[in-house]
């Protein structure tokens, strides 16, 4: 049963958040929301432990479609970074602000960039593209993520500065437009650079929050050097080009690891 510790801990964390928010906010939705997400993630981990081929994809679809279709389109909640800025500026700790605090600001201290690997609805689509591992050298254009970050902040700030009326409706259409833009750029970059995760590496503004916190992540893939034969197979299949043979926190692209475990599946010696 020890092998099921990780999914049990992950489920316990999300259930704790669910109960805490339900009690403090007096809203049963939080119990459903975080319980559903926690169960979906735990299910994916259990399927991985049982060597199910599409374990991570199951969780991606369960969580990604729930947040995109149900929360975003049906409930009309902008769960993108613009939604976070919007609720932050209004001083309301709801929806996107809670989502960002749990999944993208403090959550990475526990599970690193796990959001990117198991729940992001943008990556959910991009992972269906043909370039599972990058076929070109990494580009030095990661600074573009800060441009997108600043633009999203300026956009929402402008709504308040110029006292735009019906901000809720504007934010809903910003969610739709923003997602269409992300998908267009993500698919375009994937084919341009032959890399499904090019958008994640160069443009995604959310990584401005994720990367610094992921440096301290408790949940990390580590290498048992007594088993490693330096075959390089782990690096060849890594979608984020992380050097998994280096256990230090300063390893190459260390804050990029999305916990997809493709490296562990490819390792012939089970060193990861």
Regions found by a protein language model. Give the residues of each.
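Short linker/helix segments within small regulatory modules
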Residues: 247-260
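Non-ligating segments of multi-cofactor redox enzymes
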Residues: 1-245, 255, 265, 269-272
């Amino acid at each position: 049963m020890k092998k099921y510790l990780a999914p049990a801990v992950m489920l316990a964390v999300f259930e704790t958040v669910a109960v805490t928010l339900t009690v403090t906010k007096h809203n049963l939705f939080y119990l459903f929301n975080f319980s559903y997400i926690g169960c979906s993630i735990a299910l994916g981990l259990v399927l991985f432990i049982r060597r199910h081929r599409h374990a991570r994809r199951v969780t991606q679809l369960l969580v990604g479609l729930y947040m995109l279709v149900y929360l975003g389109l049906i409930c009309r909640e902008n769960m993108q970074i613009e939604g976070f800025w919007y609720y932050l500026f209004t001083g309301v700790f709801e929806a996107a602000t809670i989502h960002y605090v749990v999944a993208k600001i403090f959550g990475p201290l526990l599970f690193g960039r796990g959001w990117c690997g198991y729940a992001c609805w943008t990556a959910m689509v991009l992972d269906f593209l043909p370039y599972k591992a990058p076929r070109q050298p990494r580009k030095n254009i990661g600074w573009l993520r800060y441009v997108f970050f600043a633009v999203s902040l300026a956009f929402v700030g402008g709504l308040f500065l110029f006292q735009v009326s019906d901000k809720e409706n504007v934010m809903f259409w910003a969610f739709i437009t923003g997602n269409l833009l992300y998908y267009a750029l993500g698919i375009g970059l994937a084919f341009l650079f032959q890399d499904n995760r090019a958008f994640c590496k160069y443009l995604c503004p959310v990584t401005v929050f994720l990367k610094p916190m992921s440096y301290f992540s408790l949940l990390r893939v580590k290498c048992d050097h007594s088993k490693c034969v330096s075959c390089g197979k782990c690096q060849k299949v890594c979608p984020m080009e992380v050097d998994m043979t280096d256990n230090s926190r300063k390893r190459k692209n260390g804050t990029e690891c999305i916990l997809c475990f493709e490296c562990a599946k490819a390792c012939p010696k089970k060193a990861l």
